[in-house]
Amino acid sequence: MDVVGKFSQMFLALGVFALVFVGALILASLFKGRRGEKVQAGAFVLPALLLLAVGLLYPAVLTILKSFVIDGPGGVGLQNYLDIFTRTENLLVLRNTALWVVLVPLVSTAVGLLYAILVDRARIEAFAKALVFLPMAISMVGASIIWKFVYEFRPNVRPQIGVLNAILKALGLDTQNFLLNGPANTFFLIVVMIWIQAGFAMTVLSAAIKGIPDDIIEAAKLDGVGGFKLFRFVTLPSIRPAVVVVVTTIGIGTLKVFDIVRTMTGGQFDTSVVANEFYNAIFRYNRDGLGSAFAVLLFVLVVPIVVYNIVQMRKDA
């Protein structure tokens, strides 16, 4: 389909949406009283439901159906899912994704929490927080390019422009190709995501810490509770809802990580993750069935985290 055709479809969809919305409002104006209020409420909800159905529900159902279509010879079955969970290269992708999902939320939250506690009520608190939060203002691709220069490797005969290798060379140590040598290269990519997300964790947790009533802190200190015990028995339980939100939010973002891997290694050298393989299957190998299976897997992994987050928020409300 050419560009004109795509734009025509887009404007047609917008026109249909506008007609439905106007028609619903006209219908609502014909009714009065409670019935009219209900119809009017439905008139405002209906367009949103239509958008969800067209933009979310229909593509989701279509993706699930496509995931059972076997690429190549055709047919329907579980072969795409079997490929994901049996082929060596795909098992490596799942392992890498698991490492990302476990390490990034936990380390980012721990670093953000530690930093929030250390700079709390310090003279340079605002400046110190701004330094850690700045990476959040950088796009994933921009952060990846920055860290790619940090990890840059050149043969010993050439001057090192990568920060880490320049330091190693200055210390008389052997330089390393950080993005090539596995499995450590996956951890070097994970560092980039932690660097970005630590600022988010610090901001949310710092606000939660400041929300703890001073009376509780003072009462605990009068009872002889201080230092780590104060953190364990007073601070941490008080900010638990914020910790849950931070961990789950970062976890969801980490499951969908794509930009960092794509920019820094392209998924090569055993660093690929589920989102990157979804892209490769669809756009590089033209395997719509396998790509859809990866997308469904990603959805299945994200849903439990979202549900858990909602349940915890309702409990703490």
Residue ranges and their predicted role:
Residues 4-6, 29, 37-317:
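A structural signal for multi-pass alpha-helical bundles of membrane permease subunits
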